[in-house]
């Protein structure tokens, strides 16, 4: 039974903007790289527009929805009798533990991300890079442009730095605001992210990211003597580091960690 026509009022508190364009949904799901043994994680399936296309893969699918109204609707739409591979989980994705999934080393993640939680969700994926193989995420166009920005632009910041440690964007396409209900005031973009495997990931990325977060929290304020000394020992000027974090500087820091 198709329950997508059932009206459920979107919750502003959850940042709900339901994707209603089936062509966009199909195009996004086709970007997901799924092997025969991979497990699919869908973030915030809403009314199941993406889920219906994911079902064609016949892989195990975990659709994680925080809104119980929607998770109940999805259970009716994808009953276990006909969709034994689709598991509807009423839970906050931010709190979801990937390790509870059997064979969770090869996860393909997809989702239309709430704008206000985009950074938190992306950092959760970065922190769990060892589980995630690839991800297709729909985000606010402004956030996408930041992720796609180069080091010599004002958009460059902590998100593209983090992405450079854990993976890279391989494909992207624009999504107009009218493809959603309710229609947001901004446009969106779909990004396909390929995550590095353990051997390809930058060493000490967790330690470096902790330091980068501290630096961006400080902005251009004077840092503590300890952090200034830390950067100096890496041969890095703080202002240059903040404005233009280049790959060779990252490896200067790696040498510091390897001492």
Each language-model region and where it sits:
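C-terminal lobe and adjacent flexible extensions of AdoMet/dcAdoMet transferase-like proteins
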Residues: 214-259
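Catalytic cores of RNA-modifying enzymes
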Residues: 1-214, 218, 236
């Amino acid at each position: 039974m198709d329950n997508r026509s059932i009206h459920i009022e979107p919750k502003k508190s959850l940042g709900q903007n339901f994707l209603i364009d089936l062509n966009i949904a199909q195009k996004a799901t086709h970007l997901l790289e799924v092997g025969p043994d991979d497990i699919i994680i869908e973030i915030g399936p809403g009314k199941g527009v993406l889920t219906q296309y994911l079902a064609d893969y016949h892989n195990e699918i975990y659709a994680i929805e925080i809104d119980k109204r929607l998770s109940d609707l999805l259970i009716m739409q994808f009953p276990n009798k006909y969709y034994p591979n689709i598991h509807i989980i009423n839970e906050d994705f931010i709190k979801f533990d990937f390790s509870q999934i059997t064979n969770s080393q090869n996860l393909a993640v997809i989702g239309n991300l709430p704008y206000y939680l985009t950074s938190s969700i992306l950092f959760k994926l970065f922190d769990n890079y060892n589980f995630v193989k690839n991800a297709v995420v729909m985000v606010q166009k402004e956030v996408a442009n930041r992720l796609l920005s180069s080091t010599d632009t004002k958009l460059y910041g902590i998100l593209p730095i983090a992405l450079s440690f854990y993976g890279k964007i391989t494909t992207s396409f624009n999504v107009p605001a009218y493809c959603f209900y309710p229609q947001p005031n901004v446009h969106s973009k779909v990004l396909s992210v390929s995550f590095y495997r353990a051997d390809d990931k930058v060493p000490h990325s967790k330690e470096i990211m902790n330091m980068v977060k501290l630096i961006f929290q400080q902005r251009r304020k004077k840092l503590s003597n300890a952090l200034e000394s830390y950067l100096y020992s890496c041969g890095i000027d703080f202002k240059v580091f903040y404005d233009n974090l280049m790959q060779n500087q990252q490896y200067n820091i790696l040498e510091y960690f390897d001492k």
